[in-house]
From Swiss-Prot:
[4Fe-4S] cluster 1 binds at residues 46, 83, 117. NCBIfam families: miaB-methiolase, MiaB/RimO family radical SAM methylthiotransferase. This is tRNA-2-methylthio-N(6)-dimethylallyladenosine synthase. The keyword Iron applies. Monomer. Pfam families: Radical_SAM (PF04055), TRAM (PF01938), UPF0004 (PF00919). Its main location: cytoplasm. Residues 37-154 form the MTTase N-terminal domain. Residues 419-487 form the TRAM domain. The gene is miaB. Its EC number is 2.8.4.3. It is an enzyme of class 2 (transferase).
Length: 490
């Protein structure tokens, strides 16, 4: 598995509606007339973590009437949703916790919680190293946050080793989805997690150890969540999973729904006009998925398919279980049904044993397939993974040099593709008034580019959430273009 990475950030989530799904968690709300408690959520890592952070806010809102804030100074609860993909992930978490400790010294009643993949790895060691942390929970137990919160607030003065029930990093099947409140969103795009964990066990990856084996949500559960989002005005869905195209959800009759079939079901949900998904694995990118691109216009013309290396030798060492020829053949089949497809991928540069020839294979692959963009990083060991036992025989200086060369190739490709959009007409979903250009609306094209176009005051209201076509006149940046409104499709 490979995750698309974001810079660590805090996200604000709208206050959720009441729902019966948390009825079994009979926690008290704030007393009448008392100000609502506020929770600040710092999110690191992939889209799965962004999704999980939204659910953390929803769970605490539903159980304790909390509201999410993006102002850390006013928060009553601080939650860190951690990611273990990047180098020295654990130390970065403890470094940030050190800064949070100062906030707790100023506000002793402040509750601090650590969740996500680092929490899953470290467990109760987090409270041993940082005893001011009140609760620790894994990706599969975020639905138990209300219970952990209640237990932590009653044990403020208890030493970490004597606390009871404030650490839960277990893997309780996929039950968390059964206890989450109904989704509540603002905007026209939403993430929907369709599965958890990964069973591919790539030699460099910690995900199977932090999120567990692959477990797919039942088909009806996934569709019910998407239906609810569509009723709230969502028009674009991104299906999430560490190995999303390995989805095998159970149907009512006990049969299994595979990923390609799921795409057809989602495409028939009233109101959903766009479907994206991440992160996929080449082993699971089957012909029936490619056929879905030929049949479903809702599937966008953008695919993120991590390859990690252009060298068969390195792919074997990574235990990716496919070759470059297989990968290229898949892309060629896809291009045959979607010639306008934009590709992105993940790459690890400087994996143990990578020679100059191996690196050139990776560079040549990037040039041959003309990737639109990529998430590329130098290799660093992840504790507990098979690759961590390999000799890290590529010097840091060489890794950095190769990464710079590789990323320039990708940047050049991105810029070229953006320049080629000038003169073309793109379908765009309008989302907001542009902050820097108040006379213009901002939307997203199928190929992920941000698109600006001038709009009247009336259009600034009428076109929100609508699909339009825009003829591109110039580019603003490698990932943003500007154009003129051609037609309103809704």
């Amino acid at each position: 598995m490979s995750a698309t990475l974001f810079d660590p950030k805090s996200i604000a989530v709208s206050n959720p509606v009441d729902t019966s799904t948390q009825a079994s968690l009979a926690h008290a709300s704030q007393p009448t007339g008392q100000a609502k408690k506020k929770v600040y959520i710092a999110t690191q890592g992939c889209q799965m973590n962004v999704y999980d952070s939204e659910k953390m806010g929803n769970v605490l809102g539903d159980s304790h009437d909390m509201v999410v804030t993006d102002n850390i100074e006013e928060a009553d609860v601080l939650l860190m949703n951690t990611c273990s993909i990047r180098e020295k992930a654990q130390e970065k978490v403890f470094s940030e916790l050190g800064r949070w400790r100062k906030l707790k010294e100023e506000k002793p009643d402040l509750v601090i919680g650590v969740g996500g993949c680092v929490a899953s790895q470290e467990g109760d060691n987090i409270q041993k190293r940082a005893p001011y942390v009140d609760m620790v929970f894994g990706p599969q137990t975020l639905h138990r946050l209300p219970e952990l919160y209640d237990k932590s607030t009653t044990q403020r003065n208890v030493k970490p080793k004597d606390r009871i029930g404030t650490v839960d990093v277990s893997f309780p099947s996929i039950e968390k989805f059964d206890f989450l409140p109904e989704p509540k969103v603002e905007g026209y795009r939403a993430f929907v997690s369709i599965m958890e964990g990964c069973s591919k066990y790539c030699s460099f990856c910690v995900v199977p150890y932090t999120r567990g084996e692959e477990l797919s949500r039942p088909l009806d559960d996934v569709l019910a969540e998407i239906d609810s989002l569509a009723e709230q005005g969502v028009r674009e869905i991104t299906l999430l999973g560490q190995n999303v195209n390995g989805y095998r959800g159970e149907k009512d009759d006990g049969s299994i729904c595979r990923f390609a079939e799921l795409l057809h079901y989602v495409a028939h949900v009233d109101g959903i006009e766009r479907i994206r998904y991440t992160t996929s694995h080449p082993l699971e990118f089957t012909d029936d998925i490619i056929e879905a691109y030929a049949k479903l216009p809702q599937l966008v013309s953008h695919l993120h398919l991590p390859v990690q290396s252009g060298s068969n030798k390195i792919l074997a060492a990574m235990k990716r279980n496919h070759t470059i020829d297989v990968y290229i053949n898949q892309i060629n089949k896809l291009m045959a049904v979607r010639p306008d497809m934009h590709l992105s991928s993940d790459f690890i540069i400087g994996f143990p044993g990578e020679t100059e020839e191996d690196f050139l294979d990776t560079l040549n692959l990037a040039k041959a397939l003309d990737f639109d963009h990529s998430y590329s990083f130098i290799y660093s060991k992840r504790p507990g993974t098979p690759a961590s036992e390999l000799p890290d025989d590529v010097s840091l200086a060489t890794k950095k040099e190769r990464l710079a060369i590789f990323q320039k190739v990708i940047r050049d490709s991105t810029l070229k593709k953006t320049e080629e959009m000038v003169g073309k007409t793109l379908r765009v979903m309008v989302e907001e008034i542009a902050d820097r250009y108040p006379d213009q609306l901002l939307g997203t094209a199928d190929n992920t580019r941000s698109v600006l176009f001038k709009a009247t005051e009336q259009q600034k209201t009428d076109l929100m959430g609508k699909f339009v076509t825009v003829k591109i006149t110039d580019f603003v940046s490698p990932h943003m273009v500007r154009g003129e409104l051609v037609d309103i499709l809704d």
